[in-house]
Regions:
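The first (N-terminal) embedded transmembrane alpha-helix
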Residues: 5-11, 51-70
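Hydrophobic alpha-helical transmembrane segments of multi-pass integral membrane proteins
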Residues: 9, 61-63, 122-139, 215-219, ...
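Short, hydrophobic transmembrane alpha-helix segments
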Residues: 18-22, 68-81
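Alpha-helical transmembrane segments
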Residues: 75-91, 157-172
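Transmembrane alpha-helix/helix-exit interface in multi-pass inner-membrane proteins
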Residues: 166-189
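Membrane-proximal soluble regions of multi-pass membrane proteins
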Residues: 184-186, 190-229
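Pore domain of cation channels
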Residues: 212-219, 227-264
Length: 264
């Protein structure tokens, strides 16, 4: 596909050479304008997918659209739990899709131009995910033997709780992945020395894509440590420690909740 696109571009340039100067200039302006618009559209799409304030707004809209109609059929708590699960599914799928598809150039352009405060990114990521875990815990707190009026079977409610906890865990680490990528390219853009130390040392020496930062976040979340990617600055080591502690705390609470569910 890239070979075909390159051949088509070369053929277009050959054909343009034979055009008059004014027509050739107008055509180049259209090409550059179209490329600029395309970059703006791609940047806006990535912001909508990855930044937490847009993720929160999107999740709220999806949750309301699912919960309100369901509240007419089942209990409000059950409707809220299913609505939150639906919003988490949409959010995680969009972030994973972006991580899987964007390349080195798109990653560098997007995160280099990002003007998000690193501290605010971490605070919002932690706050929103703890809030989400609290809401889903409240929604399924009726799984014990003394249940009020419930429409859904207990096994289905346990399933909703399980997948919600899993997706909240993924959303937590997606937020840290965005933070790591933002911090990495921010430090890169602040120094003019190409040999200056970066916050991460990726094996292979290639320019990282967003998926590499998702990999780092998942690795810290699952093993509570760095693996083959090295943390090279004190600043990023502090963030890794915070993420490890949060992941450990979250995992401990989730395991305790699951054990209590199956022993009721």
């Amino acid at each position: 596909m890239q070979y075909f696109a390159g051949s088509l571009s070369a053929l277009s340039l050959i054909l343009v050479v034979d055009l008059p100067t004014d027509q050739r200039s107008a055509m180049f302006k259209q090409l550059f304008f179209g490329a600029g618009v395309l970059l703006m559209v791609q940047s806006a799409r990535l912001r909508w997918m990855l930044l937490d304030r847009y993720r929160l707004l999107r999740s709220f809209v999806v949750g309301v659209l699912i919960s309100v109609p369901l509240a007419l059929l089942i209990s409000p708590r059950e409707a809220l739990a299913i609505g939150m699960l639906g919003s988490l599914v949409v959010d995680v799928c969009l972030v994973c899709r972006a991580a899987w598809r964007i390349d080195e150039t798109q990653t560098k352009q997007f995160f280099s131009a990002l003007r998000e405060g690193p501290d605010h990114l971490v605070e919002r990521t932690i706050g929103l995910n703890l809030l989400g875990f609290g809401i889903i815990s409240l929604c399924v707190s009726d799984l014990g033997p003394h249940v009020y009026v419930s429409v859904l079977p207990r096994d289905l409610r346990v399933l909703v709780f399980f997948f919600s906890v899993l997706l909240i865990w993924m959303a937590l680490h997606h937020g840290f992945a965005v933070h790591y990528a933002s911090l990495y390219f921010k430090r890169k853009s602040q120094t003019s020395d190409s040999s200056a130390e970066s916050i991460f040392e990726f094996p292979g020496g290639h320019s990282p894509v967003f998926f590499d930062f998702v990999y780092v976040a998942y690795t810290v979340g699952m093993t509570f440590e760095m693996s083959d990617v090295g943390a090279r600055t004190t600043e990023v080591r502090k963030i890794v420690v915070v993420q490890s502690l949060l992941a450990f705390l979250y995992t401990t609470i989730a395991i305790s909740a699951f054990i209590s569910l199956f022993t009721l």
